[in-house]
């Protein structure tokens, strides 16, 4: 142990914070993370994000910085941009957004003026806060027209969206979602945008990893601009990114800096570069396939006879993506109770509103269950089949579920598919 505070380990300097980190590691290892927007980053991403790039200020862009000493920052940002363009087949990439919300704010700043009309999927029907929710900047700065899913099948009707767009004439048409379990028709959105002379922006934050692996239709050929986070299915650091056609490059760069942000977080950008390298590998493609397969296994199990008898249903009857939306409107449980029940057995999910939900947002009538983190742990068909049965049994039995027995099954899965083996030897603490 040293008296020089600069060289003390975290455990030596701040044991309270170190204990919280150790506690979080134990939680992630011993439970099953099934929040659809969460994932586990590889060791190399952890190392990159904890590197000395934490120290570097680099306002501007490679070759045009407002600070000196940016030669290595330029290298890693160029790597991140070029790798992102290659992975997604895009003409332009900006990797500086701190998060998905900042990326989305920059997109709207580049494509619209305050007071212009934007049209995206309603938050209550699976859209995102930044697509026009009234308390969000997007709902305060822009006029909003929201489209919705159909009440009979909970899917989008592109003919009705076209009719609405012709009536509303938005300046920006938004595709993408945060809770919609089916593919969207990007070609149809492009056609509608062209017909009403709107820009098409696609937010692919949730399904970007599937797109990178070729397992989900890519919005890049159709959209004027595409935004994404780098975590979720991509499995990189928590951050944002923007892709577009080259004609929007200057506006988007200016919208990110100085429009929305000052200096970029270089430690996050170097981690994005690593994540984009991983996204081009065969291992990544295999992981995305297991992510998809796992979601479909869970959806199928949750449509079983025991779940139906308990009033548990799967929205749209299945899934095309990495998440399953569970409809509990006819169940004895609400979303909060179901989330708490699964938490008790060691499975972390989030309660989620369903379209036309009669319950308030903090309670909800649904669950959103995701598979990316388990796929990263190595879950295969057998593992997903077991966790699907645990979830279905818990939801079907409700308050009468044997939580102790179900938790034992979860613990066995956590041991069978270990997380961050040997992390204690990585000297992170």
Curated annotation (Swiss-Prot):
Pathway: One-carbon metabolism; tetrahydrofolate interconversion; Amino-acid biosynthesis; glycine biosynthesis; glycine from L-serine: step 1/1
Subcellular location: Cytoplasm
GO molecular function ontology, one term from the record: pyridoxal phosphate binding
Cofactor: pyridoxal 5'-phosphate
Subcellular location, principal: cytoplasm
Top-tier EC class: transferase
Location of N6-(pyridoxal phosphate)lysine modifications: 232
Residues holding (6S)-5,6,7,8-tetrahydrofolate: 123, 127-129
Annotated site, Plays an important role in substrate specificity, chain positions: 231
GO cellular component, one term: cytosol
E.C. no: 2.1.2.1
Keywords: Amino-acid biosynthesis, Cytoplasm, One-carbon metabolism, Pyridoxal phosphate, Transferase
GO biological process: one example: glycine biosynthetic process from serine
Function of the protein: Catalyzes the reversible interconversion of serine and glycine with tetrahydrofolate (THF) serving as the one-carbon carrier. This reaction serves as the major source of one-carbon groups required for the biosynthesis of purines, thymidylate, methionine, and other important biomolecules. Also exhibits THF-independent aldolase activity toward beta-hydroxyamino acids, producing glycine and aldehydes, via a retro-aldol mechanism.
Oligomeric and partner information: Homodimer.
Family recorded in the similarity comment: Belongs to the SHMT family.
Protein name: Serine hydroxymethyltransferase
Originating species: Corynebacterium diphtheriae (strain ATCC 700971 / NCTC 13129 / Biotype gravis)
């Amino acid at each position: 142990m040293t008296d020089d505070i600069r060289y003390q380990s975290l455990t030596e300097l701040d044991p309270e914070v170190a204990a919280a980190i150790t506690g979080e590691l134990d939680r992630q290892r011993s439970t099953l993370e099934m929040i659809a927007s969460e994932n586990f980053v590889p060791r190399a991403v952890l190392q990159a994000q904890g590197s000395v790039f934490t120290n570097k200020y680099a306002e501007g862009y490679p070759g045009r910085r407002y600070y000196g000493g940016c030669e290595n920052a330029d290298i890693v940002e160029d790597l991140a941009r070029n790798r992102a363009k290659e992975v997604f087949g895009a003409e332009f990439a900006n990797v500086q957004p701190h998060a998905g919300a900042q990326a989305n704010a920059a997109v709207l700043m580049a494509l619209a003026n305050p007071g212009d009309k934007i049209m995206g999927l309603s938050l209550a029907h699976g859209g995102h806060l930044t697509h026009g929710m009234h308390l969000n900047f997007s709902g305060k700065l822009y006029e909003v027209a929201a489209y919705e899913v159909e009440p009979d099948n909970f899917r989008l009707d592109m003919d009705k969206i076209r009719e609405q767009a012709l009536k509303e004439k938005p300046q920006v048409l938004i595709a993408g979602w945060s809770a919609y379990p089916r593919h969207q028709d990007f070609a149809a959105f492009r056609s509608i945008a062209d017909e009403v002379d709107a820009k098409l922006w696609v937010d692919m934050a949730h399904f970007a990893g599937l797109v990178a692996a070729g397992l989900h239709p890519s919005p890049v050929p159709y959209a004027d601009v595409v935004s994404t986070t780098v975590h979720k299915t991509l499995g990189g650091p928590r951050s944002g990114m923007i892709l577009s056609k080259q004609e929007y490059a200057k506006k988007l760069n200016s919208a990110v800096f100085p429009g929305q942000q000052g200096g970029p977080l270089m430690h996050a950008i170097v981690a994005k570069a690593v994540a984009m390298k991983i996204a081009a590998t065969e291992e990544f493609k295999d992981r995305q396939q297991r992510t998809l397969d796992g979601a479909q296994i869970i959806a199928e199990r949750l449509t079983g006879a025991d779940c139906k008898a308990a009033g548990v249903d799967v929205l749209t009857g299945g899934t095309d993506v990495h998440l399953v939306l569970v409809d509990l409107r006819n169940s004895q449980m609400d979303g909060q109770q179901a989330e708490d029940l699964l938490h008790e057995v060691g499975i972390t999910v989030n309660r989620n509103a369903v379209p036309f939900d009669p319950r308030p947002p903090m309670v909800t009538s649904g669950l959103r269950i995701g598979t990316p983190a388990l796929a990263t742990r190595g879950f295969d068909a057998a593992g997903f089949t077991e966790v699907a049965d645990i979830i279905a049994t818990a939801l079907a039995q409700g308050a009468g579920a044997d939580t102790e027995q179900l938790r034992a099954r979860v613990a066995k899965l956590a041991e069978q598919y270990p997380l961050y083996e040997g992390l204690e030897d990585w000297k992170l603490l």
